[in-house]
């Protein structure tokens, strides 16, 4: 049975499977449910700019659809609903999305299970058919139930008509059964701790995404201007290198003088990989490298290709400096200030759990079509004080900065039970990468570990690559 909580009384009696319900009855009945499915319908993906339209709460027997925008005393109702849900296990599919909207209205569930995360834990980064971890996919997989998504989005122009209400209710009807089916698989493979951890963590991630980061805009503008000036200077050095080389100037300099008596222009766009490939091939460089996606060989001006050959021509180091600065300007430049949210005044990104690598990631694309943007990666901020000093806490607050020391390597030692690694950590041996280098390279063997980092940088780097290749 579907029970609608709304002041839109015109719906009353129009269909036998949907009945009106008072707020008091809904709150009382939900308080008796130890496990509930929870879902939302919204006008978009942004909890600050978009509106919450409905909240669905229920189980296989009864589903409550709350017409969020058309209930009286909404704030008071949300406070009471939040108190009730504190004692319930709330099951979501893609919990992070719904939690971000619910947090905005004072609903903060304590005990959460996400069937989306539950499914990702089961296939643990292995190749997986696209769409199989959607609600529609897991309902079909475990329950042989088809959830019709054809009416998705109709709520925006039809409102809460019966087919939209049924669609919204369906999203919570089967969540408990899906969770139970997943839990059997988790138990079989000893995944209970992972499931518990990830479902606790998703509550935190939703909160962190809503909090965002505060940016000192005046200081950021100064940084951007300084970075752009450095980039312009590097481009001028590249152009001058062409002008000063008789062979290169003959081929790559426009012989026609500027109408206003300026310098002759250079016929290379240093920001164009295609043009730069042609240029460096003309210098006799080998630009071939394997494409990560196709596995086929291709020409590239990637730093990995050019660095080993930089001794072949003085313009190569200049170009590498230019490309590095260009990345700084494009990745850590005005795109940041452009993404400061008009409502919160902060930068927001998206975090994703349970990647193939086992790590957390952030960033990715947001929006559609021309409005699509590349979100900022909060997990890849350079160790540059000019940049980091622009990220500031609120007035009267401080940042707390913490990090695990060699987290992956500790796990490797624990899982492998390698005696030398275990002994190293039990004795608080210091830098693991230097320790491994001392085992691999004879020249490092009798050198104190704290000196290997400075005296044998390459050997330590090789050892580090070895450690992370395994861990």
Report residues per predicted region.
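Short, well-ordered loop/turn and helix-capping segments at boundaries between secondary-structure elements
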Residues: 104, 123-127, 144, 184, ...
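Function-dense linear segments that define catalytic or interfacial modules
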Residues: 56-61, 65-69, 351-447
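Entry/capping segment at the start of metal-dependent catalytic domains
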Residues: 21-50
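Active-site-proximal helix-loop-helix substrate-binding element of RNase H-like nuclease domains
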Residues: 2-17, 46-187, 195-199, 205, ...
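Phosphate- and divalent-cation-binding pockets in alpha/beta enzyme and binding domains
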Residues: 100-101, 278-279, 411
């Amino acid at each position: 049975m579907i029970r609608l909580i709304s002041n839109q009384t015109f719906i009353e009696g129009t269909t036998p499977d949907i009945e009106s319900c008072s707020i008091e009855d809904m709150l009382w009945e939900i308080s008796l449910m130890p496990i509930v499915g929870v879902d939302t319908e919204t006008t978009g993906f942004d909890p600050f700019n978009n509106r919450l339209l409905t909240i669905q709460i229920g189980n296989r027997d009864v589903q409550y659809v709350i017409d969020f925008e058309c209930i009286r005393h909404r704030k008071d109702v949300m406070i009471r609903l939040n108190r009730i849900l504190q004692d319930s296990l709330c099951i979501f599919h893609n919990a992070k999305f719904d939690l971000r909207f619910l947090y905005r209205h004072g609903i903060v569930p304590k005990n959460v299970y996400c069937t989306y995360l539950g499914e990702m834990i089961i296939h643990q980064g292995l190749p997986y058919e696209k769409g199989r971890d959607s609600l529609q996919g897991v309902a079909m997989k475990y329950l042989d139930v088809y959830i019709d998504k054809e009416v998705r989005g109709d709520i925006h122009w039809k409102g809460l008509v019966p087919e939209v209400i049924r669609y919204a209710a369906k999203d919570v009807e089967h969540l408990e059964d899906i969770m139970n089916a997943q839990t059997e698989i988790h138990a079989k493979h000893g995944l209970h701790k992972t499931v518990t951890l990830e479902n606790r963590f998703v509550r935190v991630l939703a909160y962190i995404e809503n909090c965002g980061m505060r940016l000192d805009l005046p200081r950021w503008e100064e940084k951007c201007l300084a970075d752009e000036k450095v980039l312009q200077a590097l481009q001028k050095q590249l152009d001058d290198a062409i002008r000063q080389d008789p062979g290169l100037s003959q081929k790559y300099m426009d012989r026609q003088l500027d109408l206003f008596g300026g310098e002759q222009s250079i016929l290379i766009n240093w920001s164009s990989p295609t043009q730069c490939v042609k240029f460096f091939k003309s210098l006799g460089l080998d630009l071939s490298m394997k494409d990560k996606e196709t596995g086929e060989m291709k020409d590239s001006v990637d730093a990995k290709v050019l660095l080993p050959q930089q001794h072949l021509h003085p313009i190569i180091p200049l170009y590498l400096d230019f490309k590095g600065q260009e990345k700084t300007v494009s990745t850590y430049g005005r795109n940041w200030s452009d993404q400061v949210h008009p409502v919160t005044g902060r930068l927001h990104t998206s975090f994703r759990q349970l990647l193939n690598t086992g790590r957390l990631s952030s960033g990715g694309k947001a929006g559609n079509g021309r409005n699509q943007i590349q979100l900022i990666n909060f997990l890849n901020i350079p160790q540059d004080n000019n940049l980091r000093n622009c990220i500031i806490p609120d007035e009267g607050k401080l940042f707390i900065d913490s990090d695990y020391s060699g987290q992956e390597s500790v796990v490797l030692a624990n899982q492998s039970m390698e005696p030398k690694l275990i002994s190293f950590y039990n004795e608080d041996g210091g830098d693991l990468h230097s320790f491994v280098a001392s085992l691999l390279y004879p020249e490092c063997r009798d050198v104190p570990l704290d000196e290997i980092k400075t005296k044998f940088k390459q050997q330590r780097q090789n050892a580090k690559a070895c450690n992370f290749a395994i861990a």
